[in-house]
């Protein structure tokens, strides 16, 4: 048995307090966000938020882990065939077993989106397809939610083209806004991860009251 098996909640919380200070720790600990889509963006965003100390997440995806996901998504060979919601929850609890992780293994549609995300004010859009992204963003803005979306992170172009833009007080878009996976050698881990980090960081900023980019 590893030494980590004996680490309790108090030790994890104290380690986060030492890193961030009590004020930031408690703001994050008392916050929650929903992640729609657990692919290259969502699986990495979830990991970053849990490492930062967020108190709760809702993970939503209908898909299972496939070998083709491993080039950019935060999963391992042992997860192939598992629902992404279950695989992500397992990994996140290996980082912090005390974070509250709710899951919903469902296909998000215009008809069910409001009900799925009704208990969350911060929604992270992490879908693959443009039409699904637009559907969720529009649905959540109609529900007066704050949305952090990803758009344009394909290929291996310059990292510096990926930026965070504030569109309205309720909508932030991270990415280069241009590249499509069909045009630039598909999706690769570095730029996908950079975009995921932009989204995770913006969510942290919103939680901590920093709404500018």
Language model regions located:
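Hydrophobic/small residue at the entry helix of a nucleotide-binding pocket
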Residues: 41-42
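A structured beta-alpha segment of the ubiquitous adenosine-cofactor-binding alpha/beta core
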Residues: 85-91, 95-120, 127-130
């Amino acid at each position: 048995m590893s030494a980590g098996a004996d680490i309790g909640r108090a030790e994890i919380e104290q380690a986060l307090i030492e890193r961030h200070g009590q004020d930031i720790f408690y703001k994050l600990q008392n916050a929650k966000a929903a992640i729609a889509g657990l692919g290259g963006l969502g699986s990495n965003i979830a990991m970053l938020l849990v490492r930062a100390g967020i108190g709760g997440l809702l993970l939503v995806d209908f898909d299972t882990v496939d070998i083709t996901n491993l080039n950019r998504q935060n999963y391992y060979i042992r997860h192939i065939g598992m629902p992404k919601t279950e695989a992500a929850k397992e990994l996140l609890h290996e980082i912090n077993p005390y974070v509250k992780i709710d899951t919903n293994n469902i296909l998000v549609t215009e008809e069910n989106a409001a009900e799925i995300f009704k208990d969350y004010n911060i929604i992270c859009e992490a879908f693959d397809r443009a039409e699904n992204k637009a559907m969720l963003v529009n649905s959540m803005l109609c529900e007066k939610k704050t949305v952090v979306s990803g758009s344009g992170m394909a290929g291996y172009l310059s990292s510096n083209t990926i930026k965070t833009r504030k569109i309205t007080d309720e909508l932030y878009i991270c990415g280069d806004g241009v590249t499509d996976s069909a045009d630039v050698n598909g999706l690769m881990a570095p730029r996908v991860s950079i975009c995921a980090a932009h989204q995770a960081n913006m969510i942290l900023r919103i939680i901590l009251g920093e709404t500018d980019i």
